[in-house]
């Protein structure tokens, strides 16, 4: 189901973004878990798209294992939901390990979950 587009909806989005805190726990697990729980349908093949720029968590392996537990494979080995990701090259002053960790994490999640990872390498 699509969210209805209207001037008030757009205004609400802009106002929400004004107070948005750009720093978070940078973990995709909660969003993926919610998306799989909310949208999984055994009669449909759906995809989740994850957009991000860094990963600050302690363990990539823990995230991969958590998503493996959430996004189960069927009898044929296909995952319930395909996971695709886009990585943005956001550097505050210079490249840092968090951006590369995000790319490594999402590349592995996309691979394991029948998806595609696109890592953007420069600003346009």
Protein language model features and the residues they cover:
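Long, low-complexity, Ser/Thr/Pro- and Asp/Glu-rich intrinsically disordered
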Residues: 7-10, 29-33, 37, 63-65, ...
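Von Willebrand factor
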Residues: 8-46, 57-58, 87-92
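VWA/integrin I-like adhesion module and closely mimicked acidic/polar interface patches used
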Residues: 19-20, 54-112, 118-120
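Gly/Pro- and small hydrophobic-enriched strand-loop and loop-to-helix capping segments
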Residues: 45, 115-124
């Amino acid at each position: 189901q699509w969210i209805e587009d209207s001037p008030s909806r757009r205004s609400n989005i802009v106002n929400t973004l004004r107070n948005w805190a750009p720093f978070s726990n940078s973990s995709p697990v909660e969003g993926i878990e919610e998306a799989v729980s909310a949208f999984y349908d055994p009669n449909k093949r759906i995809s989740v798209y994850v957009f991000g720029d860094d990963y600050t968590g302690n363990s990539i392996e823990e995230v991969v294992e958590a998503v493996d537990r959430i996004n189960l494979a069927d009898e044929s080995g296909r995952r319930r939901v395909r996971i695709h990701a886009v990585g943005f090259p956001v550097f505050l002053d210079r490249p840092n390990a968090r951006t590369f960790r995000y790319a490594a994490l999402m590349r592995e999640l996309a691979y394991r979950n029948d998806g595609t990872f696109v890592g953007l390498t420069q600003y346009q």
